[in-house]
Curated annotation (Swiss-Prot):
Gene behind the chain: pheT
Organism: Bordetella bronchiseptica (strain ATCC BAA-588 / NCTC 13252 / RB50) (Alcaligenes bronchisepticus)
Cofactor(s) the record lists: Mg(2+)
Domain FDX-ACB: 703-804
CDD domains per record: PheRS_beta_core, tRNA_bind_bactPheRS
Keywords carried by this UniProt record: Aminoacyl-tRNA synthetase, ATP-binding, Cytoplasm, Ligase, Magnesium, Metal-binding, Nucleotide-binding, Protein biosynthesis, RNA-binding, tRNA-binding
Protein name: Phenylalanine--tRNA ligase beta subunit
Length: 805
């Protein structure tokens, strides 16, 4: 909201400067976003009167003016402005004047004729971009008067950034109330005595929708002169408040809206074809608005109709059909209280906004409508003339303002400072909040213009604002420092984040709400948790997997020429669970486990001239996952399985101690192609609880004996997983004390014979490497051979394996 300081000071004029005024408003919650001068700095410009004008002897487009600048002698000024004429009052930059931009005025000869100064346009003074001619000033201004004083150009324009709850401050009067409360300066509110009623013409109005309109008032005014000029003082205030002057009737309506916060509408009475009705629109109805936009209406939008013809979009904008023009003679002046809920969001549906809707959807004073009708009428009669009829005022459904109780002790506790009872009473009085004292409580009845006061904390906020946040002492919080034991067997989210980051992954944070298609495609979830009020229409469901969001970020980076992307996210997912009840951290019916997901795409390692380039694959990311589990990695199992987001032949279910904890695999080719990725990213998703638990390190004796390495190659069924054989080896070691010296076993080679035409390969060779070491003695060949034989026998018995020659 923008307004000139002079307008504000016409209602309340505290003895403080502009900067202090801006500071106090900001500290009271009315943020002054910007202050700027009404005009740029310039000097030496005065009011002047063109006494005579003659053609230039050597230039057709120039004229020689004799100008009275109040000094007692006429100045000769050469001017080329098309509107220069005798009798005109204009700005004159005297010799020695300095204009915006640093231009200095001196005596000059123009085509042989001396010019002692310059007559100025609005653009040359920095007042507007208008340079079509000289700036015409009111004839009543005295020549020689400094132009800055004559036009109040030292005024300051305030721009406020208001919060949505402070609708009462969307007017000069509202801001003036605040200034009066903050400074204790008396407030002079705009007022008008009821105008004499000289005609008895009325326009019947029926309110058919009390849930739309709670109060409707209006009056007929006949014989107005719509061509009357808007007074300069009003035009200046409107322009400095960011409003364009249109015509006297429109300007008066806008002026009162800005001054007292009362949107109103002026109908051309002769264009209204019947009695007025206020109702909800009907399907199929249309309206051409004042901005030229034609809109299709529906029952969710309020309208004012004449007979069956829609004339106005209630609380938003009038219609073109009944708009006033310069030929208008008779008008109907309307002001109403529209329920905020009935106006909110309606203008945005039609992709525009209006000053009226901006105010009505936040709440406009419903008690002062008759007084404001009189104020507007007085201005119309004074400027445009006419005869006023009686005011018809219908009240059908006004808000009931329930008293709000504020406990003084509660106020002290919330603010952290003991504001005296007398000062609290004074604050409420200065704010215009009627109250009663009941013991240590204040019972306040919110005024009709304060829609933001509903609960006790609202009143405490009012006390804090006027008391002054700067007066509240800074008190550091005091708490008993208590050491909490951190269990070694469990790690927190930050520790897990550091682990993943150490594996060359970068953390991202996505929205928890996603597209419904993502849930269906990536998680196979046809019944996700849906949002009642999504922030965007496509983000309509809660995610049950983190994978889709990571793939979307990979796509975003790939489109921007990134060739290697490694990301992770730690966040909650949402699953339906009818068995889950409400709790401190739970919502009934929705399970919210914490998950860790990662994605790797592009090169397996950073590009380096001495290292062959290859794409990251399943086993690279499998190694990353195993590294996250540390000593518990030997309890991990990767079981071939299918998941909607993953490649059917390159995906695995991750199990820990036999329990499923997540998934690992390449992205499904369909989703890879859909994301326009030239090769598939590898993704994983893990239950955080499985990662949080860790195995404590066990101290064991460090062997001084050399290790022995032996290899064993076996033929087995081609479909047998290598992990099954490693599990058999681990079971044999645990069961047989003689195998306690076997420290590790790994697969180091897989070999298959080339298939013969028409035949399938039924066997494969798996080569295992074993590390054997004793802590007491050096192992001899007999002991080593015996251990390898025992392992081979266990594998033969369990998997029908045979040793490869």
């Amino acid at each position: 909201m923008q307004f000139p300081e002079s307008w504000l000071r016409s209602l309340v004029n505290p003895s403080i400067g502009t900067d202090e005024l801006a500071h106090r408003l900001t500290m009271a919650g009315l943020e002054v976003e910007e202050t700027e001068p009404a005009a740029p700095p310039f000097t030496g410009v005065v009011v002047a009167h063109i006494v005579d004008i003659a053609p230039h002897p050597d230039a057709d487009k120039l004229r020689v003016c004799q100008v009275d600048d109040g000094s007692g002698a006429l100045l000769q000024i050469v001017c080329g402005a098309p509107n220069a004429a005798a009798g005109l009052t204009v700005p004159l930059a005297r010799v020695g004047a300095e204009l915006p931009g640093g231009m200095k005025i001196g005596v000059a000869k123009m085509r042989g004729v001396q010019s002692s100064g310059m007559l100025c346009s609005a653009r040359e003074l920095g007042l507007s971009q208008d340079h079509a001619g000289l700036l015409e000033l009111p004839a009543a201004l005295r020549p020689g008067t400094d132009i800055r004083a004559a036009l109040d150009l030292d005024d300051t324009l305030f721009t406020l950034k208001l919060t949505p709850n402070r609708a009462d401050c969307l007017s000069i009067l509202g801001v003036a109330r605040e200034v009066a409360a903050l400074t204790g300066t008396p407030l002079t509110a705009p007022a008008a005595e009821p105008v004499p009623v000289t005609i008895d013409h009325r326009l019947p109005v029926a309110i058919q929708a009390p849930d739309l309109c709670g109060r409707f008032a209006g009056r007929v005014i006949q014989g107005v002169n719509a061509r009357a000029a808007t007074p300069e003082w009003m035009k200046t205030r409107l322009e400095r408040a960011g409003q364009r002057s249109v015509s006297a009737l429109v300007d008066i309506s806008n002026y009162v809206m800005l001054e007292v916060g009362r949107p109103s509408h002026v109908f051309d009475l002769d264009k209204i074809g019947g009695d007025l009705s206020v109702r909800w629109a009907r399907e199929g109805e249309t309206l051409e608005l004042l901005n030229g936009q034609a809109v299709a209406l529906d029952p969710k939008v309020g309208v004012v109709v004449a007979g069956e013809q829609v004339e106005s979009l209630a609380g938003i904008m009038g219609g073109e059909a009944t708009s006033v023009t310069l030929d208008t003679r008779n008008i109907y002046l309307e002001a109403a209280f529209w329920w905020p809920g009935a106006i909110a969001g309606r203008a945005r549906r039609y992709k525009f906004s209006s000053e009226a809707s901006h105010r009505f959807e936040r709440g406009v004073d419903y008690a002062s409508i008759p007084e404001h009708i009189e104020l507007i009428t007085r201005l119309i009669l004074d400027i445009c003339g006419g005869q006023a009829g009686p005011v018809d005022d219908q009240c059908v459904n006004l808000p009931v303002r329930e008293p709000v109780r504020m406990r003084l002790a509660r106020c002290h506790r919330v603010l952290g400072v003991a504001v005296e009872r007398a000062e609290v009473a004074q604050i409420f009085t200065r704010l215009g909040l009627p109250f009663q004292e009941q013991g240590d409580d204040f019972v306040v009845t919110p005024p009709s213009y304060r829609f933001d006061i509903e609960i006790e904390e609202d009143l405490i906020e009012e006390v804090a604002r006027v008391y002054g946040f700067e007066r509240i002492p800074d008190v550091p919080p005091v708490a008993r420092a208590k050491m909490h034991a951190q269990p070694e067997a469990r790690r927190g989210a930050h520790a897990v984040r550091r682990l993943v980051a150490a594996r060359d992954y970068q953390e991202v944070v996505n929205y928890s709400f996603v597209e419904a298609a993502w849930e269906r495609d990536y998680a196979g979830n046809d019944n996700p948790v849906r949002l009642v009020n999504p922030i965007a229409s496509h983000l309509s469901v809660m995610r049950s997997s983190l994978i889709a969001g990571l793939v979307a970020i990979v796509r975003h980076n790939a489109n921007r020429k990134q060739s290697r992307v490694r990301l992770f996210e730690l966040g909650r997912v949402f699953h339906r669970d009818p068995q889950l009840a409400d709790g401190p951290l739970e919502v009934a019916g929705v399970r919210q486990p914490l998950m860790l997901a990662g994605v790797a795409w592009g090169g397996a390692v950073e590009e380096q001239w001495g290292v062959p380039h290859r794409q990251v694959d399943f086993y690279d990311v499998k190694q990353d996952v195993e590294a996250l589990f540390g000593a518990r990695a030997d309890a991990l199992r990767f079981v071939a399985d299918r998941y909607p987001a993953l490649h059917p032949g390159r995906s695995a279910r991750i199990e820990l101690d036999g329990q499923p904890i997540g998934w690992l695999g390449e992205l499904h080719p369909q989703w890879t192609q859909q994301a326009d990725l030239h090769h598939a990213p590898v993704v994983f998703e893990l239950d955080f609880e499985a990662l949080a638990e860790r195995r404590l390190p066990a101290v064991r004796e460090l062997s001084r004996q050399p290790a022995v390495v032996r290899d064993l190659a076996l033929w087995v069924d081609a479909k047998l997983p290598a992990q099954a054989m490693l599990d058999t080896v681990a079971a044999a070691i645990a069961r047989d004390p003689q195998l306690s010296v076997v420290q590790d076993a790994q697969v180091f080679d897989v070999w298959r014979e080339k298939p013969v035409a028409g035949q399938t390969v039924t066997e494969k060779s798996l080569a295992f490497r074993f590390w054997l070491q004793d802590t007491e003695v050096t192992l001899d060949e007999a002991r080593v051979a015996d251990c390898i034989a025992r392992i081979k026998d266990a594998l033969v018995a369990a998997h029908n394996a045979r040793q490869r020659a």
